[in-house]
Amino acid sequence: MSLKILLTGSSGFLGLKLTEILSKSSNQVTGIDIKEPIKKYDNINYIKISINDYIRENKEDLNTYDLIIHTASVLPFKGKKDELYETNVDTSLNLIKEVSKLKDTFFIYVSSSGVYGKPLEIPVRTSTTFNPLDFYAETKITTEKNIENYLNINNYAIIRPRTIMGMNRKGIFQIFFTLIKYNIPIPLPNKGKQIIQFVDVADLAKLILYIGKNRIQGKWPAGASNPRPLREHLDMLGLKLDKRVLKFNINPTIFKIIGNIFISLKITSFTKWHFGAFPYDFYFDSEWKPKDFQYEFSNEETFLNSALTFFSKQ
Protein backbone atom coordinates (compact mmCIF):
# COMPACT_ATOMS: atom_id res chain seq x y z
CA MET A 1 0.00 0.00 0.00
CA SER A 2 1.32 3.40 -0.99
CA LEU A 3 1.55 6.02 1.77
CA LYS A 4 1.74 9.78 1.80
CA ILE A 5 4.67 10.60 4.10
CA LEU A 6 6.04 13.80 5.62
CA LEU A 7 9.66 13.58 6.78
CA THR A 8 11.25 16.30 8.90
CA GLY A 9 15.03 16.59 9.00
CA SER A 10 15.30 15.12 5.51
CA SER A 11 18.82 16.51 5.00
CA GLY A 12 20.26 14.99 8.16
CA PHE A 13 22.25 11.77 8.41
CA LEU A 14 19.19 9.63 9.13
CA GLY A 15 16.93 11.69 6.87
CA LEU A 16 19.22 11.07 3.89
CA LYS A 17 19.05 7.30 4.40
CA LEU A 18 15.27 7.42 4.76
CA THR A 19 14.88 9.41 1.54
CA GLU A 20 17.23 7.02 -0.27
CA ILE A 21 15.08 4.04 0.72
CA LEU A 22 11.77 5.82 0.16
CA SER A 23 12.83 7.03 -3.30
CA LYS A 24 12.72 3.40 -4.43
CA SER A 25 9.15 2.92 -3.22
CA SER A 26 5.75 3.94 -4.53
CA ASN A 27 5.16 6.20 -1.53
CA GLN A 28 4.50 9.91 -1.98
CA VAL A 29 7.16 11.61 0.14
CA THR A 30 7.77 15.22 1.15
CA GLY A 31 11.03 16.00 2.92
CA ILE A 32 11.49 19.27 4.78
CA ASP A 33 14.66 20.74 6.24
CA ILE A 34 16.26 24.14 6.75
CA LYS A 35 19.28 22.91 4.78
CA GLU A 36 19.65 21.51 1.29
CA PRO A 37 20.49 17.78 1.23
CA ILE A 38 23.97 16.79 0.05
CA LYS A 39 22.21 14.42 -2.34
CA LYS A 40 18.72 14.52 -3.77
CA TYR A 41 16.83 11.38 -4.76
CA ASP A 42 14.18 10.98 -7.42
CA ASN A 43 10.54 10.78 -6.36
CA ILE A 44 11.10 12.93 -3.25
CA ASN A 45 9.51 16.36 -2.93
CA TYR A 46 12.17 18.44 -1.15
CA ILE A 47 11.22 21.72 0.51
CA LYS A 48 13.79 23.96 2.17
CA ILE A 49 11.78 25.36 5.05
CA SER A 50 11.56 25.33 8.83
CA ILE A 51 9.00 23.10 10.51
CA ASN A 52 7.18 26.10 11.98
CA ASP A 53 6.93 27.82 8.59
CA TYR A 54 5.79 24.60 6.94
CA ILE A 55 3.04 24.19 9.53
CA ARG A 56 1.96 27.81 9.03
CA GLU A 57 1.82 27.50 5.26
CA ASN A 58 0.45 23.95 4.99
CA LYS A 59 -1.73 23.51 8.07
CA GLU A 60 -4.74 22.41 6.04
CA ASP A 61 -2.73 19.79 4.17
CA LEU A 62 -1.30 18.00 7.20
CA ASN A 63 -4.35 15.76 7.48
CA THR A 64 -3.58 14.32 4.03
CA TYR A 65 -0.48 12.54 5.38
CA ASP A 66 -0.71 8.91 6.43
CA LEU A 67 2.62 9.04 8.23
CA ILE A 68 4.75 11.82 9.73
CA ILE A 69 8.34 10.92 10.65
CA HIS A 70 9.96 13.51 12.90
CA THR A 71 13.76 13.20 12.80
CA ALA A 72 14.63 16.91 12.89
CA SER A 73 16.78 17.73 15.90
CA VAL A 74 19.68 19.87 17.02
CA LEU A 75 22.45 17.57 18.23
CA PRO A 76 24.24 18.30 21.52
CA PHE A 77 27.54 19.14 19.84
CA LYS A 78 26.01 21.30 17.10
CA GLY A 79 23.96 23.84 19.00
CA LYS A 80 23.73 26.07 22.04
CA LYS A 81 21.29 25.42 24.86
CA ASP A 82 18.64 27.82 23.56
CA GLU A 83 18.89 26.32 20.06
CA LEU A 84 18.50 22.84 21.49
CA TYR A 85 15.38 23.84 23.38
CA GLU A 86 13.84 25.83 20.54
CA THR A 87 14.12 23.00 18.01
CA ASN A 88 13.96 19.87 20.15
CA VAL A 89 11.16 21.06 22.42
CA ASP A 90 9.29 24.15 21.20
CA THR A 91 9.23 23.34 17.49
CA SER A 92 8.49 19.69 18.20
CA LEU A 93 5.60 20.72 20.45
CA ASN A 94 4.14 22.92 17.70
CA LEU A 95 4.20 19.92 15.36
CA ILE A 96 2.76 17.58 18.01
CA LYS A 97 -0.14 19.97 18.67
CA GLU A 98 -1.01 20.00 14.97
CA VAL A 99 -0.73 16.21 14.74
CA SER A 100 -3.10 15.90 17.71
CA LYS A 101 -5.82 17.43 15.52
CA LEU A 102 -5.42 14.75 12.85
CA LYS A 103 -7.56 11.62 12.91
CA ASP A 104 -5.71 8.97 10.93
CA THR A 105 -2.09 10.16 10.76
CA PHE A 106 0.54 7.98 12.44
CA PHE A 107 3.42 9.87 14.06
CA ILE A 108 6.95 8.57 14.63
CA TYR A 109 9.38 10.48 16.82
CA VAL A 110 13.09 9.67 16.75
CA SER A 111 14.24 10.26 20.30
CA SER A 112 17.59 9.13 21.75
CA SER A 113 19.00 6.36 23.91
CA GLY A 114 20.74 9.23 25.71
CA VAL A 115 17.60 9.52 27.82
CA TYR A 116 19.00 6.60 29.84
CA GLY A 117 22.34 8.35 30.42
CA LYS A 118 24.44 5.85 32.34
CA PRO A 119 21.82 3.08 32.45
CA LEU A 120 20.52 2.13 35.87
CA GLU A 121 20.25 -1.50 34.76
CA ILE A 122 21.66 -3.71 32.00
CA PRO A 123 20.24 -4.68 29.62
CA VAL A 124 18.00 -1.64 29.27
CA ARG A 125 14.38 -2.79 29.39
CA THR A 126 10.96 -1.24 28.92
CA SER A 127 10.86 -0.62 32.66
CA THR A 128 14.29 1.04 32.91
CA THR A 129 14.10 4.52 34.43
CA PHE A 130 15.49 7.53 32.58
CA ASN A 131 18.80 8.88 33.88
CA PRO A 132 19.76 11.83 31.63
CA LEU A 133 23.26 13.27 31.91
CA ASP A 134 22.96 16.27 29.61
CA PHE A 135 20.53 18.92 28.39
CA TYR A 136 20.06 17.24 25.01
CA ALA A 137 18.65 14.13 26.67
CA GLU A 138 16.38 16.30 28.81
CA THR A 139 14.93 17.92 25.67
CA LYS A 140 14.21 14.47 24.26
CA ILE A 141 12.45 13.40 27.46
CA THR A 142 10.37 16.58 27.46
CA THR A 143 9.22 15.94 23.90
CA GLU A 144 8.42 12.31 24.66
CA LYS A 145 6.22 13.51 27.53
CA ASN A 146 4.54 16.06 25.25
CA ILE A 147 3.73 13.27 22.79
CA GLU A 148 2.21 11.20 25.60
CA ASN A 149 0.13 14.18 26.73
CA TYR A 150 -1.19 15.24 23.34
CA LEU A 151 -1.46 12.15 21.13
CA ASN A 152 -3.62 9.05 21.22
CA ILE A 153 -1.48 6.11 22.34
CA ASN A 154 -2.47 4.15 19.22
CA ASN A 155 -1.29 6.85 16.85
CA TYR A 156 2.39 7.20 17.63
CA ALA A 157 5.68 5.41 18.15
CA ILE A 158 8.87 6.64 19.81
CA ILE A 159 12.24 5.22 18.78
CA ARG A 160 15.40 5.44 20.90
CA PRO A 161 18.46 4.53 18.81
CA ARG A 162 21.81 3.45 20.17
CA THR A 163 24.96 4.95 18.63
CA ILE A 164 24.16 5.37 14.93
CA MET A 165 26.89 4.23 12.56
CA GLY A 166 27.28 4.50 8.80
CA MET A 167 29.14 6.18 5.99
CA ASN A 168 30.29 9.73 6.82
CA ARG A 169 28.93 9.54 10.36
CA LYS A 170 30.76 11.98 12.60
CA GLY A 171 31.20 11.67 16.33
CA ILE A 172 33.39 10.00 18.90
CA PHE A 173 34.15 6.98 16.73
CA GLN A 174 35.36 9.10 13.84
CA ILE A 175 37.85 10.49 16.35
CA PHE A 176 38.85 6.93 17.25
CA PHE A 177 39.31 6.03 13.59
CA THR A 178 41.47 9.12 13.06
CA LEU A 179 43.66 8.21 16.03
CA ILE A 180 44.09 4.70 14.63
CA LYS A 181 45.02 6.11 11.24
CA TYR A 182 47.86 8.17 12.72
CA ASN A 183 48.98 5.48 15.20
CA ILE A 184 47.95 7.56 18.20
CA PRO A 185 46.90 5.57 21.29
CA ILE A 186 43.17 5.58 22.03
CA PRO A 187 42.15 6.41 25.63
CA LEU A 188 39.96 3.54 26.81
CA PRO A 189 38.15 4.01 30.12
CA ASN A 190 37.45 0.73 31.89
CA LYS A 191 40.09 -0.94 29.67
CA GLY A 192 37.54 -1.08 26.86
CA LYS A 193 35.61 -3.81 28.68
CA GLN A 194 32.33 -1.92 28.36
CA ILE A 195 29.77 -3.60 26.10
CA ILE A 196 28.57 -1.01 23.61
CA GLN A 197 25.70 -1.35 21.16
CA PHE A 198 25.45 0.31 17.76
CA VAL A 199 22.82 0.50 15.05
CA ASP A 200 23.48 0.85 11.33
CA VAL A 201 21.68 3.86 9.86
CA ALA A 202 20.15 1.59 7.20
CA ASP A 203 18.71 -0.71 9.85
CA LEU A 204 17.38 2.25 11.81
CA ALA A 205 15.70 3.63 8.69
CA LYS A 206 14.16 0.23 7.92
CA LEU A 207 12.90 -0.07 11.51
CA ILE A 208 11.24 3.34 11.28
CA LEU A 209 9.53 2.47 8.01
CA TYR A 210 8.50 -0.97 9.28
CA ILE A 211 6.88 0.61 12.32
CA GLY A 212 5.26 3.34 10.22
CA LYS A 213 3.90 1.05 7.53
CA ASN A 214 2.39 -1.31 10.10
CA ARG A 215 1.34 1.45 12.52
CA ILE A 216 3.06 -0.27 15.44
CA GLN A 217 2.46 1.94 18.44
CA GLY A 218 4.75 2.04 21.45
CA LYS A 219 8.30 2.89 22.47
CA TRP A 220 11.08 1.00 20.78
CA PRO A 221 14.86 0.80 21.01
CA ALA A 222 17.07 0.54 17.96
CA GLY A 223 20.19 -1.55 18.42
CA ALA A 224 22.05 -4.23 16.50
CA SER A 225 22.23 -7.80 17.73
CA ASN A 226 25.09 -9.35 19.70
CA PRO A 227 26.69 -6.30 21.36
CA ARG A 228 30.31 -6.87 22.36
CA PRO A 229 33.01 -5.14 24.44
CA LEU A 230 34.56 -2.11 22.77
CA ARG A 231 38.05 -3.59 23.03
CA GLU A 232 36.97 -6.60 20.96
CA HIS A 233 35.62 -4.32 18.23
CA LEU A 234 38.91 -2.42 18.08
CA ASP A 235 40.97 -5.63 18.03
CA MET A 236 38.84 -7.01 15.19
CA LEU A 237 39.29 -3.75 13.28
CA GLY A 238 43.05 -4.02 13.74
CA LEU A 239 42.99 -7.51 12.20
CA LYS A 240 40.95 -6.29 9.23
CA LEU A 241 43.34 -3.38 8.67
CA ASP A 242 46.42 -5.49 9.41
CA LYS A 243 47.34 -2.70 11.80
CA ARG A 244 48.03 -2.58 15.50
CA VAL A 245 45.45 -0.48 17.31
CA LEU A 246 47.21 1.35 20.13
CA LYS A 247 45.27 1.85 23.37
CA PHE A 248 45.86 3.01 26.90
CA ASN A 249 43.66 2.54 29.93
CA ILE A 250 42.21 5.45 31.83
CA ASN A 251 40.20 5.30 35.04
CA PRO A 252 36.50 6.03 34.32
CA THR A 253 36.30 8.60 37.12
CA ILE A 254 39.37 10.44 35.86
CA PHE A 255 37.98 10.22 32.31
CA LYS A 256 34.77 11.87 33.51
CA ILE A 257 36.62 14.58 35.46
CA ILE A 258 38.84 15.43 32.49
CA GLY A 259 35.77 15.52 30.27
CA ASN A 260 33.94 17.89 32.59
CA ILE A 261 36.98 20.19 32.64
CA PHE A 262 37.06 20.19 28.83
CA ILE A 263 33.33 20.97 28.77
CA SER A 264 33.66 23.85 31.26
CA LEU A 265 36.54 25.31 29.24
CA LYS A 266 34.53 24.83 26.03
CA ILE A 267 37.37 23.01 24.30
CA THR A 268 35.26 19.99 23.33
CA SER A 269 31.96 19.64 21.52
CA PHE A 270 31.04 16.54 23.53
CA THR A 271 28.77 16.59 26.57
CA LYS A 272 28.57 15.07 30.05
CA TRP A 273 26.77 12.10 28.51
CA HIS A 274 29.79 11.20 26.37
CA PHE A 275 32.15 11.27 29.33
CA GLY A 276 29.72 9.93 31.92
CA ALA A 277 28.17 7.00 30.03
CA PHE A 278 30.87 5.91 27.57
CA PRO A 279 32.96 3.93 30.11
CA TYR A 280 30.05 1.64 30.97
CA ASP A 281 27.90 -1.11 29.46
CA PHE A 282 24.93 0.09 27.42
CA TYR A 283 22.75 -2.24 25.40
CA PHE A 284 19.07 -3.02 25.08
CA ASP A 285 17.16 -6.19 25.93
CA SER A 286 17.36 -8.27 22.72
CA GLU A 287 13.69 -9.27 23.06
CA TRP A 288 12.52 -5.65 23.01
CA LYS A 289 11.73 -5.10 19.33
CA PRO A 290 8.67 -5.16 17.05
CA LYS A 291 7.40 -8.62 16.16
CA ASP A 292 8.97 -10.09 13.00
CA PHE A 293 11.43 -7.22 12.50
CA GLN A 294 15.00 -8.35 11.89
CA TYR A 295 18.15 -6.23 11.82
CA GLU A 296 20.31 -6.87 8.77
CA PHE A 297 23.62 -6.02 10.43
CA SER A 298 25.02 -7.39 13.68
CA ASN A 299 26.83 -5.14 16.12
CA GLU A 300 30.23 -6.26 14.81
CA GLU A 301 29.19 -5.77 11.17
CA THR A 302 27.79 -2.34 11.96
CA PHE A 303 31.03 -1.19 13.58
CA LEU A 304 33.34 -2.71 10.96
CA ASN A 305 31.31 -1.42 8.00
CA SER A 306 31.45 2.12 9.35
CA ALA A 307 35.16 1.88 10.21
CA LEU A 308 36.24 0.27 6.94
CA THR A 309 34.28 2.88 4.98
CA PHE A 310 36.26 5.56 6.81
CA PHE A 311 39.62 3.93 6.03
CA SER A 312 38.75 3.16 2.41
CA LYS A 313 38.29 6.88 1.77
CA GLN A 314 41.65 7.88 3.26
Give residue spans per PLM region.
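N-terminal Rossmann NAD(P)H-binding glycine-rich loop of SDR-like oxidoreductase domains
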Residues: 5-25
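NAD(P)H-binding glycine-rich loop region in Rossmannoid oxidoreductase-like domains
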Residues: 51-87, 115
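NAD(P)-cofactor binding segment of oxidoreductase domains
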Residues: 68, 79-108
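Conserved Rossmann-fold NAD(P)-dependent oxidoreductase catalytic core, especially the SDR/UDP-sugar
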Residues: 94-135
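Flexible, glycine-rich beta-alpha linker
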Residues: 117, 159-175
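Active-site Tyr-X1-5-Lys
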Residues: 131-157
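Substrate-positioning beta->alpha
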Residues: 169-175, 189-212, 218-221
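Mid/C-terminal beta-alpha module of Rossmann-like enzyme folds, strongest
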Residues: 211-270, 299-314
